[in-house]
Amino acid sequence: MLMSRALCRSWLPQVARRCHANVNVPILRINSGHPAARSCRQIHSNRKQSSNLKPTTGEPAAAEQNTPVPVNNVIKAVAFTGAFTVGCFAGATILEYENTRSLILEKARQARFGWWQSRSLADRDYWTQIKQDIRRHWDSLTPGDKMFAPILLCNLVAFAMWRVPALKSTMITYFTSNPAAKVVCWPMFLSTFSHYSAMHLFANMYVMHSFANAAAVSLGKEQFLAVYLSAGVFSSLMSVLYKAATSQAGMSLGASGAIMTLLAYVCTQYPDTQLSILFLPALTFSAGAGIKVLMGIDFAGVVMGWKFFDHAAHLGGAMFGIFWATYGAQIWAKRIGLLNYYHDLRRTKQK
């Protein structure tokens, strides 16, 4: 097998086991020096919920057979995905407008008060210098790093929350996606920032950082954010639909569905980019071939019912990335109508 799981959206045992990503990680690296890897999301079986998660021996837990998923939950999941996706892209459009407006106003202010900006640092107070240093450091980051940093922070906060015993029940309810649970919608989103194992978190963030800059440069920060967040929920929906179809309800968590979207988007946009496996630099292959192999593995996992990873979520994320690489430019161009409407609305309120 060309590559195995480093990025995993795996299936966790809901009661008897802890989320544990104890897997070997053959990681890919883009020849330009940026690392790439495989994604994983973890899954739990749908046993009676308990806030006491016992240590695992490292063996994956199989989802229980013949556990029905309520039809109402599936309908809610589909409706939430549609509404969330529309909201993300509408919000990204408004954010783009506000960022552009702020940039224009800032340039105008600098042109008018350039003498103030030209003062030496010695004439400024200590805190102003600190803020200026932080701003300069932030401005020196690549577009990908600027998108990666806040997403990493959110994942680290969620990871720390798993370590607080008093929050364990809340984390299970809202930060794991389970189609048979009472709360279905928001966990589809929050679970994409949730990792229980340090290895799981490291593998996913490592891969995301590898592809973030290529995606951010191609998409722009607002579109990148909308695609990433929407892809996370869409991959959760694919997991929900698969579990409903196979009557294998269980909890899932991990960022790999959204990351697979970035990976598939970049590999589709730049299919001739050469990838190599970390520690095996002599073995190279094209990005186009790599994504086909990864999707083939996930397709086999879905068809054969493999339980260690959430293959449906992986496959859904990859499909979203390929779709956006193919049709995203045309869809994103349609935001102009909303931009004009928001501009007129904002101007009306200012009168």
UniProtKB/Swiss-Prot annotation:
Primary location group: mitochondrion
EC number(s) from the headed UniProt entry: 3.4.21.105
Transit peptide range per the UniProt entry: 1-50
Compartments reported by the entry: Mitochondrion inner membrane
Top EC category: hydrolase
GO cellular component: a single term: mitochondrion
Membrane topology: Multi-pass membrane protein
Mitochondrial intermembrane topological domain: 95-146, 204-223, 269-276, 333-351
Mitochondrial matrix side: 51-73, 168-182, 245-247, 298-311
TM spans (from-to): 74-94, 147-167, 183-203, 224-244, 248-268, 277-297, 312-332
Catalytic activities: Cleaves type-1 transmembrane domains using a catalytic dyad composed of serine and histidine that are contributed by different transmembrane domains
Active site residues of this protein: S256, H314
Disordered: annotated span: 39-65
GO biological process, one term: regulation of protein targeting to mitochondrion
Keywords assigned: Hydrolase, Membrane, Mitochondrion, Mitochondrion inner membrane, Transit peptide, Transmembrane, Transmembrane helix
Effect of loss of the gene: Lethal with most dying before pupation. Mitochondria in the testis and skeletal muscles display morphological defects indicative of defective mitochondrial fusion. The few escapers that survive to adulthood, display neurological defects, male sterility, and do not survive for longer than three days. Also displays photoreceptor degeneration after prolonged light stimulation and abnormal photoreceptor synaptic function which specifically affects both the generation of light responses and the signal transfer across the first visual synapse.
Molecular function as annotated in GO: endopeptidase activity; serine-type endopeptidase activity
Family: Belongs to the peptidase S54 family.
Subunit structure: Interacts with Pink1 and HtrA2.
Function: Mitochondrial intramembrane protease which plays a critical role in the regulation of mitochondrial function. Essential for mitochondrial development and fusion during spermatogenesis and the development of neurons and muscles. Essential for proteolytic processing of Pink1 and HtrA2 into their mature forms. May also be involved, but not required, for the proteolytic processing of Opa1.
Protein's recorded name: Presenilins-associated rhomboid-like protein, mitochondrial
Gene that this polypeptide is encoded by: rho-7
